[in-house]
Amino acid sequence: MKKTFAFILLSIISLANAQQTDIRYIPVISTDTISTKANLYPHVLSKNKFNPLVFENGFKVGERREAVRLWDKDIFYLEFTDRKMNKRVFRQMPELKKNGKLFEIMLQGDVSWYRRYFSYRADTWDANYEHEDYFVKGDEIVNIPVKGRYKKKLKALLSDKPEITKEVDQMVGDRDIREILEKYNSK
């Protein structure tokens, strides 16, 4: 009886300790997933504007809210809801040959749209950031750098559907690009 009681007590203690293990580091090659609340600091000048560079500076994970520095090269996939309740998805894109960089998935389809954020002041929470866009159509990759010439490159990429390329001249911002690409992908 004493041996059975000791065995049950030892089993309960070992199970209780096994479930309280803190996550320290998950390597890139791991298939593990961290599901946690993260303290994603907003852009200091505008509380409703999310600064996508916060994961470069690290954020707090786990129940004890310990600071863990996570670099984008250590994260394969990152998904969260921003302050405007928009679902944001970032992942590494090996086909874009920028290994270790996270790209936001703006739109996927026949022509996919990805965005990479960067800054020259990424060491501060209030870093002003820039972005460059990548459009992928089959094996063709079109890179539009910061303040690049969207219209000319998009027209060339979408040239097989002339009715859509006419709309490229009137586009102004991201919403217009999304609408044009959604039309292209649906036809």
Report each predicted region and the residues it spans.
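Residue-level detector of intrinsically disordered/flexible regions characterized by low predicted structural confidence
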Residues: 4-5, 103
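Hydrophobic h-region of N-terminal signal peptides that target proteins for export
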Residues: 9-18
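Intrinsically disordered, low-complexity regions enriched in polar/acidic and amide residues
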Residues: 18-19, 91
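C-terminal partner/receptor-binding element of secreted or periplasmic proteins
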Residues: 154-187
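Aromatic-patch recognition
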Residues: 24-164
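Positively charged n-region of N-terminal signal peptides that target proteins for export
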Residues: 1-4, 19
